[in-house]
Amino acid sequence: MSDSREIKKPWWFKKAKEWADEFYTRDQKLEDSDRRDLSKKYATISKASVVGAATGLSAGLGGPYAYRYYTTGALKGVKLPRTILLGVVSMVIMRNVAAKIAWDKELKKLDPSGELKQNYKSAHKTVDDVSLSDNSTSVQKKYGMMKFLKYRTAPRWAMYFEGTYQHPDRKFPNPDQMVQDLKGSRRAFPPFFSKADKFWHQIDRKDNDHT
């Protein structure tokens, strides 16, 4: 029977912690040369997303006017609010499409034969297992990291990997240590953080019960 005092950590906390743990593990295995290469790859993806966003915005804003002029010979009658909305939607869609295409191309450069991609789809052995092992190659580690991070926040990762290449001391910290630091500093919070303090207290008690 479980302890009635036990509290479940919020789903968002668990998800964030799981993501942080995996990223930290992958990040620690990267060499300086890996970081530089990943920075360049994500910079390329970032540039592609900017071009895609600009193309989508231009098409969304200019499309209705071009269609109106083609069908009526005049530009009057185009509803501006609808056109702006179409432009924004087109910008977001094309940004993601362009980033995805660039991301696929960069993965292909790492895996021209398709071997890593095939392993990644395997039900028994994934590229994640290989890229996280102590014997993983530079290509496997970079491929695994890019598969993990995806492409939607390319500018952030381009800056992160370049920054940690230049300054290794700025690497992502150990998530377990971050949690311990938060626990240690919780009593410095103002009174309106009392619920957060209660949450950390219950986590402390749960951890102590298992020791």
Curated annotation (Swiss-Prot):
It comes from the Eukaryota. GO terms for cellular component: mitochondrial membrane; mitochondrion. It is found in: Mitochondrion membrane. Coiled coil: none annotated. This is PDR1 up-regulated protein 1. Disruption phenotype: Leads to an increase in phagocytosis but does not influence binding to host macrophages in infected mice, when the pleiotropic ABC efflux transporter of multiple drugs CDR1 is also deleted. The chain crosses the membrane at residues 45-67, 82-99. The keyword Transmembrane applies. Mitochondrial protein that contributes to the enhanced virulence of C.glabrata strains that acquired azole resistance. Induction: Expression is inducible by fluconazole. Expression is positively regulated by the master transcriptional regulator PDR1 which probably binds the PDRE motifs TCCACGGA (positions -770 to -763) and TCCGTGGA (positions -740 to -733) of its promoter. The gene is PUP1. InterPro entries: Pup1-like. Keywords: Membrane, Mitochondrion, Transmembrane, Transmembrane helix, Virulence. It holds the Pfam family DUF1689. It is a multi-pass membrane protein. Belongs to the PUP1 family. The keyword Transmembrane helix applies.
